[in-house]
UniProtKB/Swiss-Prot annotation:
The gene is rplD. Residues 55-66 have a biased composition (Basic residues). It comes from Alteromonas mediterranea (strain DSM 17117 / CIP 110805 / LMG 28347 / Deep ecotype). This is Large ribosomal subunit protein uL4. Disulfide bonds: none annotated. InterPro entries: Ribosomal_uL4, Ribosomal_uL4-like, Ribosomal_uL4_dom_sf.
């Protein structure tokens, strides 16, 4: 299949297997949820009765005082005691096979093409790290809510986009399923498309 280059009177030949797949909503959902779960810190922690400092001595004898029996001042029903069901650090990571991850990205790319949300150009960049220059370049393609994907890190582009709310710049190695679906449009250079196609092959 062919992708039309917006800044040239030509087309880019790409693989049907990568850019012409049927959209697998269940797979994309699973991978996106796993990606979000993996981003969670999971660093909450509380102390159980065994972990709270102190409480080694029985506060009073078992019988004869008229008071309720007690074995430690760190019981969960005491003020200053441990937590009955204490929260512990947890790893929220979900396993995603490489084949599934690649399949989800291919599925998203194919859907972006069907929805006319993927813009492919021969070259894209700015001469200086100026936001004004980037806005001007994006206006040529009528883009304002966009993910820009380049073959490698472009420092000028990255610095120029830092101050724009709905613009992000990634190299091919830095894209993920969430970033691909988070923006209204995805702008890719021809070299980035080819590099991504090789990575997903």
């Amino acid at each position: 299949m062919e992708l039309t280059l917006k800044d040239a009177q030509s087309a880019l030949e790409v693989s049907e297997a990568t850019f012409g797949r049927e959209f697998n909503e269940a797979l994309v959902h699973q991978v996106v949820v796993a990606y979000g779960a993996g981003a969670r810190q999971g660093t909450k922690a509380q102390k159980t009765r065994a972990e709270v400092r102190g409480g080694g001595k029985k506060p009073w004898r078992q019988k004869g005082t008229g008071r309720a029996r007690a074995g430690t001042i760190r019981s969960p029903i005491w003020v200053g005691g441990g937590r009955a069901f204490a929260a512990k650090p947890r790893d929220f990571d979900q396993k995603v096979n490489k084949k599934m991850y690649r399949g989800a990205i291919k599925s998203i790319l194919s859907e972006l093409i069907r929805q006319d949300r993927l813009v492919v150009v021969e070259k894209f960049g700015v001469d200086a790290p100026k936001t004004k220059a980037l806005i001007s370049a994006l206006n040529e393609y009528e883009l304002n809510d966009v993910l820009i994907v380049t073959p490698e890190v472009d420092e000028n582009l990255f610095l120029a986009a830092r101050n724009l709310y709905k613009v992000d710049v990634r190299d091919v190695a830095g894209i993920d399923p969430v970033s691909l679906i988070a923006f209204e449009k995805v702008l890719m250079t021809a070299d980035a498309v080819k590099q991504l196609e090789e990575a997903l092959a």
